[in-house]
Amino acid sequence: KKNLWKGSPFKSLTKGKASSGGRNNLGRITSRARGSGHKKRYRVIDFFRKKYDMKAKVERIEHDPNRTSYIALLKYEDNSRNYIICPQNLKIGDDVISGKNKEIKIGNCMPLKDIPPGTQVHNVELVDGNGGKLARSAGASVTLSGFDGDYAIIKLSSGESRKVRANCKATIGTVSNSDQKNIKIGKAGRNRWKGRRPLVRGVAKN
């Protein structure tokens, strides 16, 4: 945590994010006790990792107010930049790459068929090319159990086993900030910063 970037996010990879206040498109409350909270800018995360066979260096690791995990800013060989979900033990200055038959190294992204069984992975696609959907929150990972024909069998943290196409991509490692579950809110005001308003129990109402 001491190595987290203290400055502003990389501006071209952010966009505005309006608070819904728990309202839907009709202006009706659909999620109670939501509203106010600190203003946030959305960080555009690359869940696809489509810059194949191009090395990227980890430029910095940042806090993201929109998710529980940390995010890493990558600088590619063509000087373009992208944010990715930061895996545990990824350090500033590390090299990562995306593509087929790459080294089994934290932060590298490749199809499941190129990963040995028993490996912990995160940001796993459910449909090839649709971007990572599984295991994206702090401390999350899934285990590659084995293969069945054109399918890979993955075991989720819930204990459920799922089959996905072996061509689907995943990133090696576990998601960072696994201590997030131990955070003590400490005071009501901290929940207000997060946009959570007091929730009245139904039994306490008239």
What is each model feature region?
Residues 1-67, 88-206:
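Basic, glycine/proline-rich low-complexity segments that contact nucleic acids
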Residues 76-79, 157-158:
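Short acidic-glycine loop/turn motifs at beta-strand connectors
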Residues 66, 74-76:
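Structural recognition of beta-strand segments within beta-rich domains
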Residues 79-91:
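Beta-strand/loop nucleic-acid-binding surfaces
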